[in-house]
Amino acid sequence: MKDGINEKAESLIDTDFLIELRRNAYIECTENYLSTNTVAGIFGDGLPEELFYACGVTPVPIEGVDAHIFKFAKENEAAGFCDVIKSTLIYLITQKCPILYSCKMYVLQNTCTRFIAALKANTEKTVYVYTDEGELVRTLCALYGTQYDETLRQNAKADLDYIKNVLTKIKYYSDVSAQEFFLLEFYSKYMTDLDKRRKYFERLEENIAFKKERLKVAEVSALCPRGNYKSVCAEIHSPLTRIIRVWKGADYGYAHCMFEYKKETGY
């Protein structure tokens, strides 16, 4: 195995490597905090990530993804929230998550208003709700003391588009498992070096034996699935199933979630 590619194994995708990326991000974000202090926490998949790189800022997902932290909460702390918000808040309040701690600001997609309100109520850092590209650029440059670079934006956009295209190719033209594809899509974002992330996907594209014809793929929808994907995968019986993130009418959701869902899961 090299750089997350199992060249001689049954599957090329090393899921342990992908899961470990989040732990690696702890170290990378801490090192960044101690040097340039240019990490921004993000929540939501609809943010124009290329603009962060254009402003010299590294975007990293911030939601808590496990229940381990719950035991460190004070009585009734974060009660009444879904597991996603509860995990994130307890990590934030106890300062036990290096990613959350290292962020100079948090940028959130305007979707879950409960997440937005909870974060604002528990941090003195800037919590910015994304509205448009121009305002995001101005906010990033002002807070981080950087300048917008159009060349950096174009390069980052090219890398992100390439990765998105490879993911689409893997989704419809390979027989990777539901869990493998989910981790590729959602956990590769913890690879904070965008150049290394692109090279990883280049190696995947070179080594995966793609099918000639598009496969018939089923989709299972989930709310904020980084934390409950194992529970969702346990109920998936077809390898040609992909977990997608939605905000309304999801197949799987959490207790206390503000959005509608069909079946409850948890951390």
Locate each region found by the language model:
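A charged, amphipathic alpha-helical module
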Residues: 2-39, 141-252
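Short alpha-helical segments and helix-capping/turn motifs at coil-helix boundaries
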Residues: 24-32, 43-47, 89-96, 114, ...
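Short, hydrophobic beta-strand segments that form beta-sheet elements in well-ordered domains
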Residues: 38-44, 61, 105-109, 217-219
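Redox- and metal-dependent alpha/beta enzyme cores, enriched for Fe-S-associated oxidoreductases
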Residues: 45-46, 51-65, 70-73, 218-267
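Active-site regions of enzymes building and remodeling cell-envelope glycoconjugates
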Residues: 56-61, 76-79, 123-128, 135-138, ...
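Glycine-rich, anion-gripping cofactor-binding loops and their flanking helix/strand elements
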Residues: 66-102, 260-261, 265-267
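Acidic/His-rich segments in extracytoplasmic proteins that coordinate ligands and/or metal ions
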Residues: 87-142
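Extended, charge-rich low-complexity interaction segments
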Residues: 89-107, 150-166, 266-267
